[in-house]
């Protein structure tokens, strides 16, 4: 009995030590993961180290090159007074070709595309009604290329844009003028009325014999009016 109890106590001690070691290992792993997690969040660099799983020599070379980056400095040099690029910038103001805008203005207003807005006006009763779609596309393509595009916008592109703009302005002005003339002619027709001939009022005097021949309903109406006036005066 004593030997069996000693054996059980030894087993219990071993189990307690095993469970304690397991709990300690789990706590150690958990704490280490949390520390690594907070360290990755607080650091400014990438979460994965640079050169991860790379050979040692390559990793050292990468670290050396990255450490040199912060020492690299570049001082821009000003252009000379007789530099051709500076002369081109000074003479651009006298050219007839417009500049490329800096892109500070949005391409659409209030969430609506200007191209679709002009195309919708073609189907309404406005001066833009019936304007060719190709004309609107040419005009807006040139405008967007000059303002927002990164390509070349030279003399030929500007002349094409100016031609489309002049054609659209001519069409709109012609239709506005025709509509104004129609309104003026309609207003003129309304203001001009035919001359009225002078009206003559004819008064016919009845003889005394016919004055007493009044209709019966007229006499009844007169008697009712007299009775009403009498009643109103008494009240």
Curated annotation (Swiss-Prot):
The answer to whether UniProt assigns keyword Membrane to this entry is yes
SS bond partners: none
Look up keyword Hydrolase and say if it applies.
no
Q: What domain of life is recorded for the organism?
A: Eukaryota
One GO BP annotation here? phagocytosis
Pfam families recorded: NICE-3
Q: Which InterPro entries match?
A: C1orf43 (IPR010876)
State where the protein is found: Membrane; Golgi apparatus; Mitochondrion
- Please report the record's description of how this protein sits within the membrane: Single-pass membrane protein
Q: Name one GO cellular component term.
A: membrane
- Keywords per UniProt: Golgi apparatus, Membrane, Mitochondrion, Transmembrane, Transmembrane helix
- Segments traversing the membrane: 11-31
Comment on protein domains: N-terminal region is required for phagocytosis of Gram negative bacterium.
Role of this protein: General regulator of phagocytosis. Required to uptake Gram negative bacterium by macrophages.
**What is the recorded name of this protein?**
Protein C1orf43 homolog
